Amino acid sequence: MTDIVLNDLPFVDGPPAEGQSRISWIKNGEEILGADTQYGSEGSMNRPTVSVLRNVEVLDKNIGILKTSLETANSDIKTIQGILDVSGDIEALAQIGINKKDISDLKTLTSEHTEILNGTNNTVDSILADIGPFNAEANSVYRTIRNDLLWIKRELGQYTGQDINGLPVVGNPSSGMKHRIINNTDVITSQGIRLSELETKFIESDVGSLTIEVGNLREELGPKPPSFSQNVYSRLNEIDTKQTTVESDISAIKTSIGYPGNNSIITSVNTNTDNIASINLELNQSGGIKQRLTVIETSIGSDDIPSSIKGQIKDNTTSIESLNGIVGENTSSGLRANVSWLNQIVGTDSSGGQPSPPGSLLNRVSTIETSVSGLNNAVQNLQVEIGNNSAGIKGQVVALNTLVNGTNPNGSTVEERGLTNSIKANETNIASVTQEVNTAKGNISSLQGDVQALQEAGYIPEAPRDGQAYVRKDGEWVFLSTFLSPA
């Protein structure tokens, strides 16, 4: 709402302010002159009356301004009533009291949910503390706990007829470390059987005949060399192995040189020489394969350099060995037992492919999240609608309450006095101003009639010379103050 700005009276009887003038009353001894024309307002007789008329015109404009302001205020009040939506016998204060109670209930409910959320947050923080932080230096690959456990399960593998979780699966082969352990166990068992058979045969054999056979074998093999390093079987096995390798190499050489073929070896060698030169250039030039390989070798490094790949692999191997000890041998020891227990308590998440069982932490957290999400949305919507002292319903109520009741009943502006006080004062002032205007209009009409009569009579007796201001009324002189403010 804009401020009501009223125009100041142009003429006053007391000391004038800026932009005002004193009323020039008729003085004793002054020649009384009327208008020169029938509808003119000049002349000393008309001078104070014209000043009063100008004041009346300003008052009329001010009344129009007040009327416009009142119409605007009435429109604003109707708008306020529409915003408050107060109908029937329910008053605005009662409605505000209901809203206050609802807000108090919401605060209590929000406090309860805050306590629940704090408890949930403490539980989650405790779980996070038990899990521990991720160390990127010690573990270069980031996985979630479930993915890490899944990776460990896959590395550990499964027995025949089971899956990695130990559940029976018909026809499922063994895999991972369990598969290798089973194979090693089978090999060790077969070696034990062979050793047992050899021991049995040695015990049952004839040592004398063995001596003769050994002598015959020595004659066939020849004398023992002075520097004995390997036995005959080892050397024969080595020769057989080398023979197989030589035959494979010869076959590979034939295939490589294209034997038998049409191209001569020298042609192929020259071509290869050119290709090798090109390859050497590619290898040795700046940014070539050799330089890049050096960078790769530096990156790979060695076990004693922690930042190198080998160093990280060593750290990972050590960590995995430690993890294997921490994880446990089966589902009844180590982390596997803890994880099995946690799976029952916490429940499986979405990556497990199974819904969280009722009563598990994940199921309860999911239920709480759904409830809290709905409550948060409802509370946020209510907070937005209710607002604060400067916005929303609360802000509008505060602003309207201030606008209606004001801040200072004796203030100089409508906002300070309030709409209620201003309207009451304006009603009183308008009634008084209306009465004064009507009286002034009547007096002016009477003055105009008197002036007209004087003009027609052509004679006006002189007023008393006692220093008072007089006007003519009903054929005689009366005080101007009495004329303007009749009893």
Curated annotation (Swiss-Prot):
Coiled-coil stretches: 52-84, 99-131, 145-156, 177-195, 210-221, 232-257, 265-284, 289-300, 309-327, 335-346, 361-386, 393-404, 419-454
Superkingdom of the organism of origin: Viruses
Entry keywords, A to Z: Chaperone, Coiled coil, Isopeptide bond, Late protein, Virion
PTM notes: Cross-linked via an isopeptide bond to E.coli host protein DncV during infection.
Localization, UniProt: Virion
Covalent link Glycyl lysine isopeptide (Lys-Gly) (interchain with G-Cter in host protein DncV), residues: 100
Description of its domains: The central domain consists of 12 alpha-helical domains (19-40 residues long) with coiled-coil structural patterns.
UniProt source species: Enterobacteria phage T4 (Bacteriophage T4)
GO cellular component, one term: virion component
Function: Chaperone involved in tail fiber assembly and retraction. Acts as a chaperone helping to attach the long tail fibers to the virus during the assembly process. During phage assembly, twelve fibritin molecules attach to the phage neck via gp13: six molecules forming the collar and six molecules forming the whiskers.
Protein name stated in the entry: Fibritin
Major place of residence: virion
A Pfam family per the record: Fibritin_C
InterPro entries, A to Z: Fibritin_C
Entry keyword Nucleotidyltransferase: no
Subunit structure: Homotrimer. Interacts (via N-terminal domain) with neck protein gp13; this interaction allows attachment of the fibrous collar and wiskers.
SUPFAM superfamilies xref list: Fibritin
Record's signal peptide: none
